[in-house]
């Protein structure tokens, strides 16, 4: 075993069915007196139901969270925080709401508690993202990490199947790309494998029965593992492409990850043999990109970037943006090969495994 150093970063985690009821105790443990509750417009009523036990301790609600964390939304949320004299944040929802909470925690230096309702995994990472002027900026800062995360699988039972599947594939992407990170060590490798295995197993069960509480529990556990791995590992081509597609074209986050992942792995895995072997073991297939493609197809997830709003003329722009900055990746970034990847993903073709 090689030598390694692990600076382990993690929120306090409360996991299991019904754990949303622990919110009053967990908020008290944080010493929070007046939390501002964040949600998307669609989840405002769910958020109100969850925080009802803490009553008038809630300073107020901000239900404007939206994907890719636009600067104007951040500004509105900061005004809401200051206008309500809040001292902390409760974020309830998916990656968009968590992403907004992370920026507020960083900008205002306040603690947050997150209750995820999807499998995005953002709540476990120090990664933040902001979109301004059609460009998405990302970075890392320990300040954005929530103090506490409550994982209650019962809150995901009503998550629509299409969102469940793409969100789960998004989580798989975090760990799959982590397996060829230069920062990988045996601890994080185990987390990646556990997370991917749990999600690979859960997705077909969710398709068969979306209300399967055990499958929901396994998927949420997998998302936790994959998100934690991402926190400690570098990102490569897949995440760069998805951030570019999302921030520049405003494509939906989870769907973009689900579509791009098989193609990004087809590009990289021939240059990352150890990661390829691990993924072959988990997927039960020598052709991992096709196994992921089939998993998405059989679950009814979108397969092409055209389906979610990309236009043919966007391909050269995205290619050039992805090539603009250097970042670690197993395979050198080549303009023609990258364009082929994007064309295949745009058209929804089976990934090229050559």
Swiss-Prot record:
InterPro entries: ADH_Fe/GldA, ADH_Fe_C, Alcohol_dehydrogenase_Fe, MAR
Disulfide pattern: none
Gene3D superfamilies, per the entry: 3.40.50.1970, Dehydroquinate synthase-like - alpha domain
Gene: tfdFI
BP terms from Gene Ontology: 3-chlorocatechol catabolic process
Taxonomic lineage: Bacteria, Pseudomonadati, Pseudomonadota, Betaproteobacteria, Burkholderiales
Quaternary structure annotation from Swiss-Prot or TrEMBL: Homodimer.
PANTHER family with a match to the protein in the record: ALCOHOL DEHYDROGENASE (PTHR11496), ALCOHOL DEHYDROGENASE 4 (PTHR11496:SF102)
NAD is among the record's keywords: yes
Pathway: Aromatic compound metabolism; 3-chlorocatechol degradation
Protein name: Maleylacetate reductase 1
Its EC number(s): 1.3.1.32
Keywords (A to Z) from UniProt: Aromatic hydrocarbons catabolism, NAD, Oxidoreductase, Plasmid
